[in-house]
């Protein structure tokens, strides 16, 4: 299993727990960006997990080090516009969080992966 990412978690406030949401932020953001949205969802029986992307250089941004799920090299149509290695590594990290939720007793069909921007791309990649 891949090493678990650092996460901000909001535990369910009622029992039984009915599911979990693993919600990834966008490029340059933090794990807590979408935490303020949770109360508006009215899902007290759900655990929310907000993983933090590792900090790494992003070529598109002049090599600036920032929270990033994967390197973006260019916006042009190119077979190497993103780092496939970074995407695979991140996918394994998210899959490890999914496995942890299953070990916590959450059925796989009650685990939702979501994300915004770069985090949304990773959510889609993992889901496929």
Segments predicted by a language model, with ranges:
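Active-site signature of alpha/beta-hydrolase-fold catalytic machinery across serine-
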Residues: 36, 125-126
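Short helix-capping and hinge/turn segments at secondary-structure transitions, especially at repeat
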Residues: 99, 103, 119, 127-128
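Residue in the alpha/beta-hydrolase core beta-strand immediately N-terminal to the catalytic nucleophile
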Residues: 110-112
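Serine-hydrolase catalytic machinery in alpha/beta-hydrolase-like enzymes
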Residues: 2-108
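Gly/Ala-rich beta-loop-alpha elbow adjacent to hydrolase catalytic centers
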Residues: 114-119, 123
């Amino acid at each position: 299993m891949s090493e678990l990412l650092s996460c901000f978690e909001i535990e369910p406030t009622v029992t039984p727990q009915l599911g979990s949401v693993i919600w990834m932020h966008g490029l340059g953001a933090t794990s807590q960006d979408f935490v303020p949205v949770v109360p508006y969802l009215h899902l007290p029986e759900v655990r929310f997990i907000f993983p933090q992307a590792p900090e790494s250089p992003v070529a598109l941004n002049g090599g600036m080090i920032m929270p990033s799920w994967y390197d973006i090299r260019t916006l042009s149509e190119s077979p190497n516009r993103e780092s496939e290695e970074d995407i695979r590594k991140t996918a394994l990290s998210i899959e490890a969080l999914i496995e942890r939720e299953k070990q916590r007793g959450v059925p796989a069909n009650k685990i939702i992966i979501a994300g915004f921007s770069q985090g949304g791309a990773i959510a889609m990649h993992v889901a496929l």
